[in-house]
Amino acid sequence: MNQAIQFPDREEWDENKKCVCFPALVNGMQLTCAISGESLAYRFTGDTPEQWLASFRQHRWDLEEEADNLIQEQSEDDQGWVWLP
């Protein structure tokens, strides 16, 4: 993982976007990363936001590594978010 990219443990469920959002610090600048509840359910199972947050926490290292790769590829959307598939 790139040392210039850090992931604080501040994930949360965003009810409007139906996703787990988690911050990334890229050279000191904050960026928002996200993975949808649907994607978490497909990958790890779960039916509720609480279960998806638990799955995110359980698989944090793999998901952060995936986000790291997307950040390095500059895969931000129009709002500057990085979405894991």
Swiss-Prot record:
InterPro entries: DUF1488, Shew3726-like_sf. It comes from the Bacteria. This is Uncharacterized protein YrdB. Pfam families: DUF1488. SUPFAM superfamilies: Shew3726-like.
